[in-house]
């Protein structure tokens, strides 16, 4: 088991790493604190950066880039009907997520890696308030149902928006994809 030297647990946060070492049924390694930018690196700090959609800031503190992994499930097939098929993932309850919105990034799939537009949250244009993760994989055509994919939201583009029509949404998606392609060329 690992914990930081400032780790606290229990009622009133009175449990210390030394107490954990005495109580734990396994070895406990107490790790020294790390700093970045003059501030302690902590899960709270990383969660705050994610909530602010500061993916570069969060990734600078993580050992690996932030990603969301899940099994592709069937959605409502609205994206396909608009000409922008997406992969749909359930939101894992135990994961810290970035601010709801639309991100440019990439996807790792069994078929390879693709630039991706990642939507985290509701789909208000179609009255869907259930929060999901869906991604358009630029350059991919095929079926990934039941496959495991990793989505890497890397740059916040915009908040989720209720568009006045499906056509208005399609126009915005085309702009998002153009921005993604420009970003991918760099």
Residue ranges and their predicted role:
Residues 75-186:
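Phosphate/ribose-recognition catalytic cores of enzymes acting on nucleotide-derived substrates
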């Amino acid at each position: 088991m690992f914990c930081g030297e400032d780790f606290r647990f229990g009622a009133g946060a009175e449990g210390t790493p030394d107490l954990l070492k005495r109580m734990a049924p396994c070895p406990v390694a107490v790790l020294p604190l790390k700093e970045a930018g003059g501030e302690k690196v902590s899960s709270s700090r990383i969660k705050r950066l994610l909530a602010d959609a500061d993916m570069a800031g969060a990734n600078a503190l993580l050992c690996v880039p932030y990603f969301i992994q899940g099994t592709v499930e069937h959605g409502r097939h609205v994206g396909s009907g608009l000409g922008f098929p997406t992969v749909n993932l359930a939101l894992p309850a135990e994961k810290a997520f970035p601010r709801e919105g639309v991100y440019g990034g990439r996807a790792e799939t069994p078929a390879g890696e693709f630039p991706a537009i990642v939507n985290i949250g509701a789909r208000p244009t179609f009255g869907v308030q259930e929060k999901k993760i869906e991604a358009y994989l630029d350059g991919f055509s095929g079926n990934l149902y039941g496959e495991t994919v990793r989505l890497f939201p890397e740059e916040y583009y915009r908040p989720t928006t209720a568009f006045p029509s499906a056509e208005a949404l399609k126009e915005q998606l085309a702009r998002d994809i153009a921005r993604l392609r420009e970003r991918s060329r760099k």
